[in-house]
Amino acid sequence: MPIRNRTLSALAAAASILALGAGAASAAELKLMFQGEPFEIAALQSIAERFEAAHPGTTVELINTPHDAYNEKFGAMASTGNLPDILQLDAPFLANYVWSGYLQPVTGLVDQALIDDMTPSNVSQGTYPPDKGLYAIGLTDSTVALYGSRKQLEAAQIRIPTSVADAWTREEFEAALKTLKASGAKWPIDLFRGYGTKTEWITYAYEPILKSMGCDLIDRTTWKSEGTLDSQACIDAATMMQTWVKEGWVVPQSAGTNQFYAEGRPAALAWGGHWVYAEAKAAMGDDLVAMPLPRFGEKSTSPNGTWIFGINKETADPKLAGQFLSFMLNDAEYRKAYEEHTGFPGLKSFAAASPVYAANGPMALAFAQATESAVPRPPHPAYPTITLAFQQAMTNIFDGADPKTELSDAAEKIDADIEDNDGYAPFGGN
């Protein structure tokens, strides 16, 4: 099998978009492929209509694909060379797309004022490490916070952190779980295992624990996983998480994903994405408190990255594509739609205008993680293999498998993919 085909197979196995082909629209036509919630679909439809009105003769075709079928659809379009001018992509897969030659930098195409307005975390999720070019941009970013009930925590005499630097230590976190269990909580914490392995959740939400404890999925200088993912620090991190499950502290996968704010609040804490805030707030009101992720090592580490927009390298009119993205990201109605759904800001101006994330807002501390503790998932072309291997390893570890064996197997799979692709030059330390 050719090297590139092996890469495509790995990406498909990881349920990831692999390639963005060379389909190009005419100068007066733009094609945009995306996935999203109903409010996002409506917002983009409105944007397209108003952009067409502002640019007579231009047609914007929106290719809306359900999230679960997105990668399959994209793969089919790639195989026929019929791909969009503008495409939405999940941030950690950007390195693969750029390495494959399917994206072009957005700098010089999107308004510079928007680029200057990006948060550091937003810049990192759209940047390709070898040339440090910015290849994608979005209005939003993402994070994971630790949610709790202020009344419940105060009643149990568990302190509530007031800054990222003030995050709970590992000892405080595990003591809180024990205390909450003893005080009657059915489950001290929901890690949202109910999301399963068909999403990025395991890598997205749990890799920060490894990073906080001083290890990683892969060495980001040599780009080798063996010796890093199977290091003692990572084994200790995986063993720690396995212990939480064995102690009965974690909501089981079979219980679903809303035990923190369900009736009776079976779960005392929630290790949840920023999107959990809106639903939990509706159920809990002002009793809801958002806290930073714990410091399992020297400092707290949080994730970032979400669905962002890039421009096909082969589009017939890259300037028009850039104009559309600028129009979209500057649009007040578009921003309002995301504000109403607690979109996590990727632009500083969007954050300042958000009552949830602005200074002293209920999620201001979670937003602070974007500049103080956010670390992107490994920006490497082998990421589809990296995330698939880690997801499977952690699933097995949660189910009782030996952490050292599972992490070693995962590291071997990752390094084998990189070796099969000649190191994904210019990556690698050789």
Give the label of every model feature segment.
Residues 276-286, 296-392, 425-430:
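C-terminal lobe and pocket-closing loops
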Residues 53, 57, 128-201, 216-251, ...:
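Helix-loop-helix "hinge/cap" segment bordering the ligand-binding cleft or interdomain interface
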Residues 30-46, 65-67, 142-143, 196, ...:
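Extracytoplasmic "Venus flytrap"
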Residues 59, 243, 373-430:
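Conserved C-terminal helix/tail region of periplasmic/extracytoplasmic solute-binding proteins
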Residues 107-121, 162-166, 191-200, 213-236, ...:
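Short, solvent-exposed loop/beta-turn-alpha elements that line the ligand-binding surface or hinge
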Residues 29-31, 46, 50-121, 136, ...:
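Extracytoplasmic "Venus flytrap"/periplasmic binding protein-like
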Residues 35, 202-213, 235-317, 323:
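Extracytoplasmic/periplasmic substrate-binding proteins
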Residues 91-145, 202-205, 289-294, 356-359, ...:
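Hinge/lid segment of periplasmic solute-binding proteins
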